[in-house]
Amino acid sequence: MIGYSLNQLYKVVGITKQGVWDHFQREQTELEMIRGIMTRVDKRRKQHPGEGLEKLYWQLQPEQIGRDKFCDIFMQLGYGVVRRKNPVRTTIPAHKVFENLIEGRLVTGPNQVWQSDITYISVSGRFYYLTFILDVYTRRIKGYAVSDNLRAEANITALKMALRGVPPQQLRGCVHHSDRGSQYIDGGYLKLLRTHQIAISMGGRAQDNAYAERINGVIKNEYLIPWSLSSYRELKYYCKKAVKDYNTKRHHGTLGRCSPAEYEATWRKLPKDQRRVEVIRSENTPYSKNKLKSNVIDTSCQYPYCSLRIN
């Protein structure tokens, strides 16, 4: 058997010993970099267990790696998120319905349009129900409730929470939008809305309530389901934690990569001509700039709604 030295082998294949060493060092440096990012990803995932890779990248913003490479590497490492569909119907249709007041509406600030919806979650083989009320403009969850039934009491609890801390004068002209579920035409629920001079709006399709539908998926798929809850008591505790983390720590591209709480605080300090304007349009309704004022410019639409800014 003929023996060869490493230097002879390097010469045959056209590389140098220094080149091999440099390559090894680069690989070690990259490996250490990825391990460091993994530590940050794991820490973030403990609070936001279902957060997608692209959102994780923008949240962490690692300097040494681009978005696409980050997503590719961490997908291979098993950090991808499986999205679940929602096959269970929670809407019990009501005979009395209200007109859709928000289609095509311009929203220019907090407490102008709230959306609400009910969703379900299975815990230890039993269904429980979650009600959320969302401020469309800031994406902030204003109120929520956890229940073991579909009666209107949970909706009233969520609404009372949403109303707390908002001065009455800021609610005049606010529109509360929901689907046509019977919980939303309950006498006690309607009385609360009317007492605070909040207009009532309803949509006939899921697309008409898509902001609230999206929040259902975010709270369930990014928080509650990955936490593998085992009891009703745990569900209530972790739903509270999920809402808090969502409102204060989950960043949104539409909000300039701020959390809802950060965005609302920043928005109040902005001059009026620098505040974002949003047009509410359902998924199947074509968007037309001609219907808007000339000083409102369309920007890219990541979701079925257009985020706009006045120049």
Label the predicted regions.
Residues 9-10, 20, 41, 56, ...:
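Mobile genetic element proteins and their domesticated derivatives, centered on retroelements
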Residues 15-110, 206, 259-273:
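Basic, flexible linker segments flanking DNA-binding modules
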Residues 66-132, 156-161, 165-166, 170-173, ...:
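Mobile-element integrase/transposase regions
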Residues 91-93, 178-180, 186-191, 201-220, ...:
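RNase H-like two-metal-ion nuclease catalytic core shared by retroviral integrases
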Residues 194-198, 218-311:
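C-terminal domain-tail junction helix/linker
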